[in-house]
Structure formats: structure tokens, C-alpha cells
Amino acid sequence: MQIVRNIDDLRQEVAKLRISGAPVALVPTMGALHRGHVALVDAARSRGCEVVVSIFVNPTQFGPSEDLDAYPRREAADAAMLDGAGATLLWAPDVATMYPPGFATSISVGGVSERWDGAARPGHFAGVATVVTKLFQQVKPDIAFFGEKDFQQLAVIRRFVADLDIDIEIVGVPTQRDDDGLALSSRNAYLSPEERVTARTLPRALGEAAAAIGRGGDVAAALAAAIARLAEAGFDPIDYVALVDAASLEPIDRLDGPARLIAAARLGGTRLIDNLAVEPAP
């Protein structure tokens, strides 16, 4: 696996990859990789793709009081993991390459970005949309793979790709979880051993709510029960627990089509997010 750090080298190497005729896939990441990221590479390889992975800790998607400086950076270990997973190319630009002096453009996606994490983290999705658009322009992939754990992010990306007529297939890959159900996340490393035990309450509370709603139970009651369980376990604040339309992310109060149960809450100093598909019980 090659590692490239400037745009000219990236474009030359991607052009070489295209000679084989195989599709080129992009897996955007911020590093601190885990099995969830490997699953994205695996999904791309299963489609017969040459796999380009980007690692860039994007400052424009962090708020002023968030964890930009603390976010884990371990490129050597990440590169070894990607090499073992079969990635073809690692694109690892620095901040000056991505945001050179005079950079003045931001992409704002209305609607789907405005609630939930968009409300809790002002400016976050503009940063995401801008950097992902740049990565798309730099790599020009045929397909891009994103984890469903960041479900609102995936919805935002699908929205601007459709709105801007970007000819890239967007593939969502199911959330990868630890044995106790906690969604894999680079930020799980922030949890103390005690918090890590408590954190499993989040997927369990969501699972119970999803099952209740799927059985035809009252949506408001199921959401209230999940919030109460999280509060009792020590999550504070609880930003949201909501049942939403899977495409628009607008809140819904009954199952009429594809739906998602989404949640975000803080445990100690760590903000955790998760989501589950909700379907009517057979």
C-alpha cells in the first residue's frame, strides 16, 4: 500500500489504478482506525474496487470546545491496519494541503443537517460536507463507503451528492459493534473502564425502544423509557433520542416506512452516538 501526501501524487497514483479498469473506491476517515473502518475496506474490496482510504482529522467539523487537539492520531498503526486489510492507497494530506491560505468556501446542506447533531454541534455538517466534497474532487472515486453509525452524516452526504449531481455511488455499511453491543468508535478510547461498562446501556436502551415500537407500542412512551434508562445510568446531557424517517431524518410518531431510532448522549467527557433500524415485528 502506498502513502501519498500531496495532490499531484494522489492524482498520478489514482490514474494508475484506473488502468486496470476496476472501479476506484474511497473510504474517508479521520484515522484512529478500528474494525469498523476495516469493514468499510472489506465492503469496497467485495465490490472489486481499488481502495483509496483517506486519513485527515478535519478541523472544520470540530467546534471550539470539542476534541480536535485530543483526537487520537496514530498514522503508523493505521497504515499497518489498512495494509493488512488490503487497501491500495492511503491519502494522508495535512491541513495546509486541504485548506491553503485564502480558502473561503463552505458547503451548507439544509434540511437533513439542521436537527439532531446539526443543532447540538453548530457548523459540524458544513465542515463534513466541505471536506468530503474536496475528497471527492481529489480522488474522483466511482464509489464511496461510509459507516451507518454516523447515520445523519450519511444522510447529509447522500443529500448533497444528489443535489449537486455528483456521479459517485454512496454505500452505507452496517455499524460494527463490540460483543456487548457498543458501536465501535474512535472516541470510545476516551472512556474510563467504568464508563466503558456503563456505555453498553446506550445500545441496550435503543434496542428495547426499537423492539417496543416495532411491536406497535407507543412511540413517545418508548422514547421516554429509553431516555429514563440512560439518565439513570449516568448519561448527562442526553442530546436526543428520537424516531425519524430514515431518509429525511424528520421525527415521526408511527412506522409508515423505513425508520431509524437515533440517539446522542454524553457519558463523562465522551459524547456517544448510536442508531438502529426500526421495523414492524413480523
Swiss-Prot record:
Positions of ATP binding: 30-37, 147-150, 184-187
- Which SUPFAM superfamilies does the UniProt record give? Nucleotidylyl transferase
Which EC numbers characterise this protein's activity in its record? 6.3.2.1
Q: Which GO terms describe its biological process?
A: pantothenate biosynthetic process
Subcellular location, record wording = Cytoplasm
Q: Which UniProt keywords apply?
A: ATP-binding, Cytoplasm, Ligase, Nucleotide-binding, Pantothenate biosynthesis
Provide the catalytic activity annotation: (R)-pantoate + beta-alanine + ATP = (R)-pantothenate + AMP + diphosphate + H(+)
Q: Anything else the record notes?
A: The reaction proceeds by a bi uni uni bi ping pong mechanism.
Q: Which PANTHER family match?
A: CYTIDYLATE KINASE/PANTOATE-BETA-ALANINE LIGASE (PTHR21299), PANTOATE--BETA-ALANINE LIGASE (PTHR21299:SF1)
Q: What is this protein called?
A: Pantothenate synthetase
Q: Which organism is it from?
A: Rhizorhabdus wittichii (strain DSM 6014 / CCUG 31198 / JCM 15750 / NBRC 105917 / EY 4224 / RW1) (Sphingomonas wittichii)
Its taxonomic path starts at: Bacteria, Pseudomonadati, Pseudomonadota, Alphaproteobacteria, Sphingomonadales
